[in-house]
Amino acid sequence: NKWGGNTGRTMSGGVEIKALDIPKKLFATARLFEEGGSLTIVATALIDTGSRMDELIFQEFKGTGNMELVLDRKLADRRVWPAIDISQSGTRREEKLLPPETLHAVTLLRRTLATMHPVEAMEQLTAKLGKFKSNQEFIDLISGAHVMD
């Protein structure tokens, strides 16, 4: 709120309406590079704090990201690593990043893991991945077989 100026207009949660202008401009710079490389911005957000302001700020910036990695305390408490909630994590526009056969395998894998509890999903995934020399071997298996049998 300090840097946003004082317009007298606030959003829910008590945030001055212009307070997020500077951070939004910073995140927008990642899209401004045309044929000049790229800019990667890594940001973190603590959510589910009960604060309307925290939730508002998170929702404002959620749409600017290309990827979300959601950590799960239940996984960490059980010492399941990485403590990632697979069903809530992902990259937008995967179809532009992955070849069609890999995208198909990843989609099948995600659908299967989404039916499981997050702890079970990560335990299954890490156990299965541990049996292969490379991620590509695992993807090749998924492409030609039933997932997670």
Task: Set out the residue ranges of the language-model regions.
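P-loop NTPase catalytic core
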Residues: N1-D149
